UniProtKB/Swiss-Prot annotation:
Transmembrane segments: none
Family named by the database record: Belongs to the universal ribosomal protein uL22 family.
Species of the source: Vibrio parahaemolyticus serotype O3:K6 (strain RIMD 2210633)
Keyword Ribonucleoprotein: yes
GO biological process: translation
A Pfam family the protein falls into: Ribosomal_L22
PROSITE patterns in UniProt: RIBOSOMAL_L22
Keywords: Ribonucleoprotein, Ribosomal protein, RNA-binding, rRNA-binding
Protein's UniProt keywords contain Cell cycle: no
GO MF annotations, alphabetized: rRNA binding; structural constituent of ribosome
Function text: This protein binds specifically to 23S rRNA; its binding is stimulated by other ribosomal proteins, e.g. L4, L17, and L20. It is important during the early stages of 50S assembly. It makes multiple contacts with different domains of the 23S rRNA in the assembled 50S subunit and ribosome.
Protein name per UniProt: Large ribosomal subunit protein uL22
HAMAP family documented for this protein: Ribosomal_uL22_B (MF_01331_B)
Complex formation: Part of the 50S ribosomal subunit.
Length: 110
């Protein structure tokens, strides 16, 4: 039994989001929620919201017991990048890349 939740186009760099995803991969959902609650990274709040959605999906759609769930898979894929311009001296300009992510969490029975 698996339940999936996704957050597409999350406004955070995939590199930064993967740091948080690596912390909870393979952990029980209780332990993962605790880790995310006390992490002071922006990505932790986004990943926590997706994890809570996956838990709710497992409970509602599959009738799973929350105590038996763990984070089977979590991965962060790169979303589209917004290109922005930052003016510089002497008529030059630099390109700013505002990256986005697709966060996917899969919870399953142990």
């Amino acid at each position: 039994m698996e339940a999936i939740a996704k957050h597409n186009f999350a406004r955070i760099s995939p590199q930064k989001a993967r740091l948080v995803a690596d912390l909870i991969r393979g952990k029980s959902v209780d332990q993962a929620l605790e880790i995310l609650t006390f992490s002071n990274k922006k990505a932790a709040a986004l990943v926590k919201k997706v994890l809570e959605s996956a838990i709710a999906n497992a409970e509602h759609n599959e009738g799973a017991d929350i105590d038996d769930l763990n984070v089977a898979k979590i991965f962060v894929d790169e979303g589209p990048t917004m290109k922005r311009i930052m003016p510089r001296a002497k008529g030059r300009a630099d390109r700013i890349l505002k990256r986005s992510s697709h966060i996917t969490v899969v919870v399953a029975d142990r």
